[in-house]
Amino acid sequence: QIRKVGKSYRTFYMIEFAGINPETGAPQFYTNDLDENGNYIKEITEKYSEANAIVLDKHAEPNVIGGLSNTLRYKWFDLNFMFSYQFGGYSYDNWAQKTEHGGNDLEANIPTYYRDSWKQPGDITKYELFIESPDVAMNKSTTTRRLHSSDFIRLKTLTFGITLPQVWTQKIGVNNVRVYASANNLWTWAAYDYYDPEAVSGGSAIWGTPPLKTVTFG
């Protein structure tokens, strides 16, 4: 990340990923050299060392953060819910920088999405040839391939309750009885679903514990 006048706080600064070469299965990057007018030249290279990092129009801090809650009541019944959401931010998958090693080392288990890696000429995919070669492995490179939207909508709480009529409860010497069931983090939509957007810290996703789903009764 970088702090620069005119840019959002926690703006990302890194090399641009240019996809996988469909003929060789090797990762590609934009060189992003500057021309005489200060514009980026989008030439493609397979050598990470030939690519230049640039200031992106993507930042860790979301543009919108909010929530929505309400309580609905009908006779004995009540239903309370609360949604939380955020939009406009991005996060970098630091954990993938360890796992996306293409078979080059044994630092971590391989993600399941590597089933869709390049296998033969003509394959169009996001993931490189799976081979023990440091020239192909992506685990030591920081690129936009691992930069993901952190947009999400989450049902944070959902509570359903029943308040028994006093004509029933007073017969046993009790003025008020309410029974309820409550669930937390029951449902989540996320723009990128390989890690929890609320487990991100400072735009970095690594080893974060996601909010747990819980159900309580009372």
Name every feature range the model reports, one short phrase each.
Residues Q1-A26, S117-Q120, T188-G218:
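C-terminal beta-signal and terminal closure region of outer-membrane beta-barrel proteins
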Residues Q1-A60, E100:
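Conserved small-residue
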Residues K4-T11, P22-T24, Q86-R178, A183:
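Extracytoplasmic gating/loop element in the C-terminal half of outer-membrane beta-barrel translocons
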Residues I41-A51, L129-T144, Y195-S201:
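Flexible, solvent-exposed coil segments and beta strand-coil junctions
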Residues A53-L56, T143-L147, G202-W207:
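Extracellular loop and loop/strand-boundary signature of outer-membrane beta-barrel proteins
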Residues V64, K75-F77, D151, G173-V177, ...:
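Outer-envelope beta-barrel architecture signal
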Residues G67-S69, T157-G161, T216-G218:
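Membrane-embedded beta-strand positions in outer-membrane beta-barrel channels/transporters
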Residues W76-F81, V167-W168:
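Repeated loop/turn-to-beta-strand initiation elements of outer-membrane beta-barrel proteins
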